[in-house]
Amino acid sequence: SLKFVYAIILLLSLFLLSMGNIPLVPCETDDDCPMEMSIPSIPNKLLFFMCWEKECVYRRW
């Protein structure tokens, strides 16, 4: 039963890691992200792109 719990925790953590698997785009020269950034499977209304450590990362609302 303990192995089952560990297996579920492992699967959940792998799922959460795969959700954030979006290729990073370098920031523009003005420390902003390109306007044409979009992810086909997620509506743009739910995402907010921001420049962090010279790469564009997304945050969900």
Curated annotation (Swiss-Prot):
Record keyword Transcription present: no
GO molecular function: metal ion binding
Alphabetical list of InterPro entries matching this protein: Nodulin_late_dom
Protein name in UniProt: Nodulin-14
UniProt signal peptide: 1-20
Swiss-Prot/TrEMBL GO biological process terms: nodulation
Other information: Contains 4 cysteines arranged in two pairs in such a way that they might be capable of binding a metal ion.
Organism: Pisum sativum
Pfam families noted in UniProt: Nodulin_late (PF07127)
Entry keyword annotation includes DNA-binding: no
Keywords, alphabetical: Metal-binding, Nodulation, Signal
